[in-house]
Amino acid sequence: MNIRSPILAMTALATLAGCSDDPSAPEGTVPVRLSVAVATTVPITLDEVSAPLLARSEIFDDGTNQLVIDRAALVLSEIELEGSTSDCDLAGSDDEGSNDDGCEEFDAGPFLLELPLDGNVDQVLEVFVAPGTYSKLEFELDKVDDDDAAEAAFLQANPEFDGVSVRVEGTWNGEPFVFVQEVDAEHELYLDPPLEVADGGETRNLTLRLDISDWFRQGDGMLVDPATALPGEPNEELVEGNIERSFELFEDDDYDGEHDELEGDG
């Protein structure tokens, strides 16, 4: 996988404390970055797919139906890194940085997370943390309304996410579709092993990896039409559960989208 830092697309990075050599960084802290990746898949059917499409899409085929995902984006809020002896309160802060509950907040949100469908590992957020042990990332999958100024500003920039927490665009058997999910849900992802941040240590990176290959898939491996998973449709709960189970978090200091511990690097 390649590494990419989409600063222009992910404006939240610019609102944080800065890069690791920023002289304004709080003394005695260490930068921890949050990156995002999509689990790599090997499409079953490639012969009718052009190379430019492959560069920006995920393609799935069950032998009967073909699903092409051109865009997958989620809205997150209250993104916090929790210490091993802390208990994050997702509603406890509206500002990035350290919280009184011993947690470090990447972003209060709402934050638009565009999933990289081209094999890249995208750096999306950064926070400066105190030395210690960190065991969990917490965040909300956030259905946005305009209850406060931050949400109103988000919707002005992203009007297609009004009342939406997940948006997927692509084709189903060659026909364009737009899938949306209207779910508010809290997520807790544990680090195994926990992240050890040493005093004066180098920048660390955590990668949030999503496996989207099963988002629109039944237990028997057959794909489902995204139109049947829209709010109120018969496959709504199936796809909602698949998305909820697709998150994985791990230490990835070499930014290759793979678990450092399993590679023998951690």
PLM features per residue range, with description:
Residues 20-266:
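A short, solvent-exposed, low-complexity linear motif enriched for acidic/polar residues
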Residues 12-13, 96:
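Residue-level signal for mature regions of secreted extracellular proteins and peptides
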Residues 9-10, 250:
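Intrinsically disordered, low-complexity segments enriched in polar/charged small residues
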Residues 1-9:
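Bacterial N-terminal signal peptides that target proteins for export
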Residues 15-18:
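C-terminal motif of bacterial Sec signal peptides marking the signal peptidase cleavage site
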